[in-house]
Amino acid sequence: GLRRGDSDFDYVSAGDINRNGLIDAYDISVVATQLEDGIENPGTDRVAGTIFLSTPKQTYNAGETVEITVKGDSVKAVNALSFALPYDQQDYDFVGIEPANLGTMENLTYDRLHTSGQKALYPTFVNLGDKQVLEGSEDLFTIKLKTKRKVTFNLKAVDGILVDKNLNMQKF
């Protein structure tokens, strides 16, 4: 979740392998695919599909919990995923993530306050070593936010990527 411009980005900027100004699932995958004896035969399946977010309603009163369902849509060969969910800290507090259908992926989600003052949640899930990839269309996890005041939910995922075992990327 570190972005170019954060006070500590320069310390880890060499880890921004894809040079997009953000430490994301791709950068983490470069190392993660080599852990736990690595991936001997990554196969030829190329990453595909998309991810979308939904909530049961649009308007929430202060103190309510917003449950954001994160669903994979026709995903194929997904070995890692990440996106940013910028939000106004005057409106929400991050409560947690409930994994649903993520297999053995490690949850590396981080709720970050950037040096610029922008708050963003970075849901990030990565397989370490050679593990089962995500396939199909199903709910992957739920993000829970607590409202601080009455809000109309309009948060959007940005900088979303899916990564396969060969480090091919699919943006969403």
Question: What is the predicted function of each stretch?
Answer:
Residues 10-15, 48:
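Glycine-rich, flexible loop segments associated with nucleotide phosphate handling
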Residues 29, 33-172:
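Acidic, low-complexity intrinsically disordered segments
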Residues 16-17, 128:
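Residue-level detector of alpha-helix boundaries and kinks
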Residues 7, 11, 59-61:
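Alpha-helical context
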